[in-house]
Structures are given as C-alpha cells and as structure tokens.
Amino acid sequence: MNDITKLMVRTAYDALDEKLGQDIEIIDIQNISVISDYLILASGNNMNQISAMVDLTNEKMAEAGFRSRRIEGNKNSTWILMDYGDVVIHVFSKEDRAFYDLERIWRDGVTMTRDDF
C-alpha cells in the first residue's frame, strides 16, 4: 500500500465519520480483486444523511487532490458508490447494506481499521 492510497482511505473514512456514518468498514481486497485495492462501506440512517456523507466525502477527496472516476446513484438513492480507483466507497441505507451484504461477498478480503492507515 502506497502513501497516496493510505491518504485516500484516511480522507474518505474521516469524511464519513464526520457525518456520523455508521459501521464504517475498510476491506482490503487487493489480493483477491483487480477492481480496486480497498472497499470502504458505511451506513446512513436516511437519504439526507447518506447524501451529506457522499457530499462531504467528495469534497474532502477533491481537497486532497483525488477525483472520482464515477459515482453511481443520486440524491434519492439508498446506495451510492464512489469509485476513486484504488478505493471504492459504498454508502448505504442500513436496509440496503443488510440486503446486499457486501461484507459476505468480499469475506475473503481483510478487514482493516482506520489506525492501519
């Protein structure tokens, strides 16, 4: 993991945390996927909170010099994906997160903490 990727993970995690994102989880998938190196998953209580989490994350990532390759979902979505290349961020409603259960799908990845970065 290089310093740029570490900064990306820290920046995204901190922005999600600042907007009171719940159950923020970092999964290292670099040994099992060519899609990305890390997934960051977070839950929000409602669409307003999800939107605020996404907006602040994009703002903080841009301030750090990172631009998203793609954003899937919109202000009315209960699952928004932000693709930053090495880091892909998923912000869900609690219900969508439980339903899609990405933690199970990526269970061969390594769960990490903010302190690892």
Tell me what each language-model feature is.
Residues 1-35, 47-80, 94-95, 105-117:
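Polybasic/polar functional segments that serve as interface/processing modules
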Residues 37-39:
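Catalytic metal-binding acidic patch
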Residues 82-84:
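Active-site beta-strand termini and strand-to-loop segments that position acidic
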Residues 98-100:
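Switch/connector loops and helix/strand junctions flanking conserved nucleotide-binding motifs
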